[in-house]
Amino acid sequence: MERKLGPEFESCVKSGRIRRFSPGPTFVAGELAAASQDLDEARRTLAAGGLKWATIQAYYSMFHSARALLYARGYRERSHRCLVIALRELYVGPRLLELEFVEGLEAGKTLRENADYYSRFSEAGSRQAVELAGSFLARARTLTSEPVRPT
């Protein structure tokens, strides 16, 4: 039985912030590669003491992991908020992805914004962001290696 998509997701579709994107699955590998590269850079930057940039790079690793998941389902996003809504709808709702990963993405976004816009960052926050990014990438790789039919 096919699930009815929720009103927040439908609102994102209606506003054009989530769109059908049939070539999406062909972009998954590139997004995962970008996530991996950002994660590697975040780890190097953190090891060198660059807390602000490590936080920002870790968030973008999570963003690319999330985007890979969306592409795998044949959609693309035009807003970070709708990306989160789409992950909840397409992956968390049907119990394909644990909520902790979406909450981690949201926490990572807050850490990135604080670092980027307000120069507020810490070693603990940077380490948390890098750890979250590594876990999210591993989970996205697992999910995209399994056949997932477009919704």
Language-model features: locations:
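Terminal alpha-helical segments
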Residues: 1-151
